[in-house]
Amino acid sequence: MSFDINWSTLESDNRLNDLIRKHLNSYLQNTQLPSYVSNLRVLDFDLGKVGPAITLKEITDPLDEFYDSIREEADQETEENNDNKEDSEHVCPDRTIANHEGPKDDFEAPVVMPSPNDIQFLLEVEYKGDLLVTIGADLVLNYPVEKFMTLPVKLSISDIGLHSLCIVACLSKQLFLSFLCDVSDPALDDNQTVLDPKGPILAATKPLERISIVRSMKIETEIGEQYQGQGSVLRSVGELEQFLFTIFKDFLRKELAWPSWINLDFNDGDE
C-alpha cells in the first residue's frame, strides 16, 4: 500500500533545514580531513520540493531494541536527577536531615511497558528528488612545498538517489527511524555517479553492499577560471569530490543504518 506525505510542510521548514545543516557540520568537525583540504563546512541544506515515494510493506510491534533504548535513557536521567539532588542536599545541611528519612524521596525511573498503541511500519522508500547540499572548502596545494597555495571552492551535491527498506516505530510518544537494506533498482544499480560533469564519469565497481542508502549522486565544483586548466588543481578537485562522496555515504550509514537509528522525542512539551 502506497501513500503520500505532505512534503511541502517539511521542505518549507527553515528550522529543519538549518538543524540538518548544523548536524552535518558537527559530523564534519569530527572527521579527519586529508592534507589537500581544510575548512570543510556545509553552507546550505535544502530538502527540495520532491519528496520520496513510500510503500507500506508490513505492520508489526516495535522491536525490543527501541524499548531498551528508552529504558536506558530514562535510567540515565533518573541517575542524573538523583546526583543533582545529592548535590543540593550537601548545600543545605538542615534539609539533608529531612531528605534522608527514607528512599521514598529518590527519583524513580518510569516503567516503560509496551502499549496497545505502539506500532512499527516496514516501509519501502524510493527517492530521486531535488535535495541540494552546498559545501564550502579550501583546497590546499602542497606542491612544490607544503601549503603552497589555498583555493576556496564551492561544491554542490544533488541528484541523490536511494531505494531502501526502513522501519519506523512509534512508541511512548517517540519515533524511531532506521534503514535496513537497499532494494534492487535497475535505474540506480546501473547509474553512474558523476563526480565531475566536465571530467571522467566514475561508476561503482564493487558489488552492492547490504546498505549504502545513497546509491547515486552528483557533485559539481566551482573554482576560479584562472585555475581550471591547471592539472594539479583538477586532480585535487577530483580527490576532494571522491572524498565527499565517501564521507556523505559513511555519515548516513553511521547515523541511519541498522543497528543505528534516529529518535524523535515528542515528550518534551508535556508538563
Curated annotation (Swiss-Prot):
Membrane topology according to the record: Peripheral membrane protein
The organism's place on the tree of life at top rank: Eukaryota
Biased composition (Basic and acidic residues): 82-107
Cross-link (Glycyl lysine isopeptide (Lys-Gly) (interchain with G-Cter in ubiquitin)): 49
Compartments, as annotated in UniProt: Mitochondrion outer membrane; Endoplasmic reticulum membrane
GO MF assignments: lipid binding
InterPro entries in alphabetical order: Mdm12, SMP_LBD
One BP annotation, GO: mitochondrial genome maintenance
Region ranges (Disordered): 73-108
Record's keyword annotation contains Endoplasmic reticulum: yes
Keywords for this protein: Endoplasmic reticulum, Isopeptide bond, Lipid transport, Lipid-binding, Membrane, Mitochondrion, Mitochondrion outer membrane, Transport, Ubl conjugation
Main location: mitochondrion
GO cellular component, one term: ERMES complex
Biological function: Component of the ERMES/MDM complex, which serves as a molecular tether to connect the endoplasmic reticulum (ER) and mitochondria. Components of this complex are involved in the control of mitochondrial shape and protein biogenesis, and function in nonvesicular lipid trafficking between the ER and mitochondria. MDM12 is required for the interaction of the ER-resident membrane protein MMM1 and the outer mitochondrial membrane-resident beta-barrel protein MDM10.
Subunit relationships: Component of the ER-mitochondria encounter structure (ERMES) or MDM complex, composed of MMM1, MDM10, MDM12 and MDM34. A MMM1 homodimer associates with one molecule of MDM12 on each side in a pairwise head-to-tail manner, and the SMP-LTD domains of MMM1 and MDM12 generate a continuous hydrophobic tunnel for phospholipid trafficking. Interacts with PUF3.
Comment on protein domains: The SMP-LTD domain is a barrel-like domain that can bind various types of glycerophospholipids in its interior and mediate their transfer between two adjacent bilayers.
UniProt family annotation: Belongs to the MDM12 family.
The protein's name in its UniProt record: Mitochondrial distribution and morphology protein 12
The organism's taxonomic lineage, starting at the top: Eukaryota, Fungi, Dikarya, Ascomycota, Saccharomycotina
